[in-house]
Protein backbone atom coordinates (compact mmCIF):
# COMPACT_ATOMS: atom_id res chain seq x y z
CA UNK A 1 0.00 0.00 0.00
CA UNK A 2 1.35 3.40 -0.91
CA UNK A 3 2.12 5.84 1.87
CA UNK A 4 -0.07 8.88 1.85
CA UNK A 5 -0.67 11.93 3.97
CA UNK A 6 -3.13 11.51 6.80
CA UNK A 7 -4.14 15.14 7.16
CA UNK A 8 -6.89 15.04 4.51
CA UNK A 9 -8.37 11.92 6.10
CA UNK A 10 -8.10 13.23 9.64
CA UNK A 11 -9.69 16.50 8.54
CA UNK A 12 -12.97 14.61 8.10
CA UNK A 13 -14.23 14.93 11.65
CA UNK A 14 -17.86 14.84 12.71
CA UNK A 15 -19.71 15.20 15.94
CA UNK A 16 -21.97 12.31 16.73
CA UNK A 17 -20.76 11.14 20.13
CA UNK A 18 -18.17 13.65 21.14
CA UNK A 19 -18.68 16.97 19.42
CA UNK A 20 -21.06 19.85 19.21
CA UNK A 21 -21.48 21.02 15.63
CA UNK A 22 -21.54 19.35 12.23
CA UNK A 23 -20.09 21.06 9.18
CA UNK A 24 -20.14 20.01 5.56
CA UNK A 25 -16.82 19.30 3.87
CA UNK A 26 -16.36 21.42 0.71
CA UNK A 27 -16.89 19.36 -2.43
CA UNK A 28 -13.37 19.90 -3.76
CA UNK A 29 -11.81 18.75 -0.48
CA UNK A 30 -14.14 15.73 -0.29
CA UNK A 31 -13.11 14.74 -3.81
CA UNK A 32 -9.42 14.90 -2.93
CA UNK A 33 -10.00 12.73 0.14
CA UNK A 34 -12.02 10.25 -1.92
CA UNK A 35 -9.18 9.72 -4.34
CA UNK A 36 -6.76 9.00 -1.50
CA UNK A 37 -8.95 6.56 0.40
CA UNK A 38 -10.06 4.63 -2.68
CA UNK A 39 -6.42 4.28 -3.69
CA UNK A 40 -5.77 2.75 -0.27
CA UNK A 41 -8.74 0.37 -0.69
CA UNK A 42 -7.76 -0.82 -4.15
CA UNK A 43 -10.10 -3.36 -5.77
CA UNK A 44 -11.05 -5.96 -3.14
CA UNK A 45 -11.97 -9.30 -4.67
CA UNK A 46 -14.42 -10.09 -1.87
CA UNK A 47 -16.56 -6.96 -2.26
CA UNK A 48 -20.32 -7.70 -2.25
CA UNK A 49 -20.66 -5.80 -5.53
CA UNK A 50 -18.59 -3.44 -7.66
CA UNK A 51 -18.70 0.30 -7.01
CA UNK A 52 -17.40 2.74 -9.61
CA UNK A 53 -16.76 5.58 -7.18
CA UNK A 54 -17.42 9.12 -8.44
CA UNK A 55 -14.87 11.39 -6.76
CA UNK A 56 -16.50 14.53 -8.10
CA UNK A 57 -19.76 13.77 -6.26
CA UNK A 58 -18.31 12.89 -2.83
CA UNK A 59 -19.91 14.31 0.31
CA UNK A 60 -18.41 14.54 3.79
CA UNK A 61 -19.19 15.95 7.21
CA UNK A 62 -16.79 17.20 9.85
CA UNK A 63 -16.73 18.77 13.28
CA UNK A 64 -14.60 18.57 16.40
CA UNK A 65 -12.88 15.36 17.42
CA UNK A 66 -11.08 12.74 15.36
CA UNK A 67 -14.19 11.21 13.78
CA UNK A 68 -15.22 11.47 10.14
CA UNK A 69 -17.60 10.32 7.42
CA UNK A 70 -17.37 10.42 3.64
CA UNK A 71 -19.98 9.17 1.16
CA UNK A 72 -19.10 8.41 -2.46
CA UNK A 73 -21.86 7.64 -4.99
CA UNK A 74 -21.55 5.10 -7.76
CA UNK A 75 -21.15 6.72 -11.19
CA UNK A 76 -24.17 4.80 -12.50
CA UNK A 77 -26.49 5.92 -9.68
CA UNK A 78 -29.72 7.49 -10.93
CA UNK A 79 -33.13 8.27 -9.47
CA UNK A 80 -34.57 5.57 -11.71
CA UNK A 81 -32.12 3.02 -10.32
CA UNK A 82 -33.19 3.83 -6.76
CA UNK A 83 -36.91 3.72 -7.54
CA UNK A 84 -36.51 0.50 -9.54
CA UNK A 85 -34.30 -1.37 -7.08
CA UNK A 86 -34.65 -5.15 -7.32
CA UNK A 87 -34.45 -7.97 -4.81
CA UNK A 88 -30.71 -8.32 -5.35
CA UNK A 89 -28.58 -5.50 -3.96
CA UNK A 90 -27.16 -3.02 -6.45
CA UNK A 91 -24.51 -0.39 -5.84
CA UNK A 92 -25.44 2.98 -4.41
CA UNK A 93 -21.87 3.88 -3.41
CA UNK A 94 -19.41 3.67 -0.53
CA UNK A 95 -19.41 5.07 3.00
CA UNK A 96 -16.13 5.69 4.83
CA UNK A 97 -16.17 6.10 8.61
CA UNK A 98 -13.38 6.92 11.05
CA UNK A 99 -13.75 6.43 14.81
CA UNK A 100 -17.48 5.85 14.52
CA UNK A 101 -19.38 2.70 13.49
CA UNK A 102 -22.95 1.67 12.68
CA UNK A 103 -24.73 0.29 15.73
CA UNK A 104 -25.80 -3.35 15.43
CA UNK A 105 -28.49 -4.35 17.94
CA UNK A 106 -27.75 -1.11 19.83
CA UNK A 107 -24.05 -1.83 20.24
CA UNK A 108 -20.79 -1.49 18.33
CA UNK A 109 -20.03 -4.48 16.08
CA UNK A 110 -17.01 -6.71 16.55
CA UNK A 111 -14.03 -5.14 14.78
CA UNK A 112 -13.40 -8.48 13.07
CA UNK A 113 -16.62 -8.01 11.11
CA UNK A 114 -15.53 -4.65 9.70
CA UNK A 115 -13.59 -3.89 6.52
CA UNK A 116 -10.73 -1.74 7.76
CA UNK A 117 -8.24 0.09 5.57
CA UNK A 118 -5.04 1.39 7.14
CA UNK A 119 -3.58 4.53 5.63
CA UNK A 120 0.13 4.92 6.39
CA UNK A 121 2.14 8.13 6.71
CA UNK A 122 5.68 7.50 7.90
CA UNK A 123 5.47 6.19 11.46
CA UNK A 124 1.80 7.15 11.76
CA UNK A 125 -1.31 5.49 10.43
CA UNK A 126 -5.05 6.00 10.35
CA UNK A 127 -7.61 3.21 10.34
CA UNK A 128 -10.77 3.86 8.37
CA UNK A 129 -13.72 1.50 7.86
CA UNK A 130 -15.35 1.23 4.46
CA UNK A 131 -18.92 0.10 3.82
CA UNK A 132 -20.38 -0.73 0.45
CA UNK A 133 -23.82 0.86 0.16
CA UNK A 134 -26.39 -1.30 -1.59
CA UNK A 135 -30.06 -0.75 -2.39
CA UNK A 136 -32.63 -3.52 -2.68
CA UNK A 137 -36.39 -3.93 -2.68
CA UNK A 138 -37.96 -5.08 0.58
CA UNK A 139 -40.81 -7.57 0.88
CA UNK A 140 -43.43 -4.84 0.93
CA UNK A 141 -42.02 -3.12 -2.15
CA UNK A 142 -40.16 -0.36 -0.34
CA UNK A 143 -36.44 0.26 -0.82
CA UNK A 144 -33.84 -0.75 1.77
CA UNK A 145 -30.32 0.59 2.18
CA UNK A 146 -27.72 -1.95 3.28
CA UNK A 147 -24.25 -1.29 4.71
CA UNK A 148 -21.94 -4.12 3.72
CA UNK A 149 -18.64 -4.62 5.52
CA UNK A 150 -16.77 -7.93 5.05
CA UNK A 151 -19.71 -10.25 4.54
CA UNK A 152 -21.97 -10.77 1.55
CA UNK A 153 -24.92 -9.94 3.81
CA UNK A 154 -25.33 -6.38 5.09
CA UNK A 155 -24.04 -5.51 8.53
CA UNK A 156 -26.96 -3.09 8.86
CA UNK A 157 -30.08 -2.67 6.75
CA UNK A 158 -32.47 0.28 7.11
CA UNK A 159 -35.39 1.67 5.09
CA UNK A 160 -34.54 4.21 2.40
CA UNK A 161 -37.73 6.21 2.67
CA UNK A 162 -39.24 8.31 -0.11
CA UNK A 163 -40.20 11.60 1.54
CA UNK A 164 -42.10 14.69 0.41
CA UNK A 165 -38.88 16.71 0.24
CA UNK A 166 -38.04 18.31 -3.09
CA UNK A 167 -36.01 16.16 -5.46
CA UNK A 168 -32.40 17.17 -6.06
CA UNK A 169 -29.60 16.34 -8.48
CA UNK A 170 -27.29 15.70 -5.50
CA UNK A 171 -26.75 11.95 -5.47
CA UNK A 172 -25.71 11.53 -1.82
CA UNK A 173 -25.68 14.00 1.07
CA UNK A 174 -24.76 13.42 4.71
CA UNK A 175 -25.99 15.00 7.91
CA UNK A 176 -26.30 13.86 11.50
CA UNK A 177 -27.52 14.57 14.97
CA UNK A 178 -26.48 13.59 18.47
CA UNK A 179 -28.82 11.16 20.20
CA UNK A 180 -27.23 9.76 23.36
CA UNK A 181 -23.99 10.16 25.26
CA UNK A 182 -22.15 7.86 22.87
CA UNK A 183 -24.59 7.56 19.99
CA UNK A 184 -25.95 9.60 17.15
CA UNK A 185 -27.93 9.31 13.94
CA UNK A 186 -26.32 9.52 10.52
CA UNK A 187 -28.79 10.80 7.92
CA UNK A 188 -28.09 9.76 4.34
CA UNK A 189 -30.12 11.62 1.71
CA UNK A 190 -30.26 10.36 -1.86
CA UNK A 191 -31.40 12.70 -4.64
CA UNK A 192 -32.98 15.03 -2.10
CA UNK A 193 -36.09 13.00 -1.35
CA UNK A 194 -34.89 9.54 -0.27
CA UNK A 195 -33.65 9.38 3.32
CA UNK A 196 -32.20 6.75 5.62
CA UNK A 197 -31.39 7.08 9.33
CA UNK A 198 -28.53 4.97 10.66
CA UNK A 199 -27.72 4.80 14.36
CA UNK A 200 -23.98 5.17 14.94
CA UNK A 201 -21.83 4.75 18.01
CA UNK A 202 -18.25 4.68 19.22
CA UNK A 203 -16.17 1.68 18.14
CA UNK A 204 -15.25 -0.98 20.66
CA UNK A 205 -12.11 -0.27 22.64
Feature-to-residue mapping (PLM):
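N-terminal secretory signal peptides that target proteins for export/translocation
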Residues: 1-2
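Bacterial N-terminal signal peptides
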Residues: 5-15
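Primarily secretory-pathway and cell-envelope proteins
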Residues: 19-97, 117-119, 153-205
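Mid-length scaffold segments of soluble, non-membrane domains
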Residues: 84-152
Amino acid sequence: MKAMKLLPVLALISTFAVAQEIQQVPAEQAGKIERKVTEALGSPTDAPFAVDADAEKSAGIKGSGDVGLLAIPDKKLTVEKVAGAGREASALGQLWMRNVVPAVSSTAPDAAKLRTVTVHDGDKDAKVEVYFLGISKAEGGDVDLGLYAKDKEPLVKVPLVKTNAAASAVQIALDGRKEGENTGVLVITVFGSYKADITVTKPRE
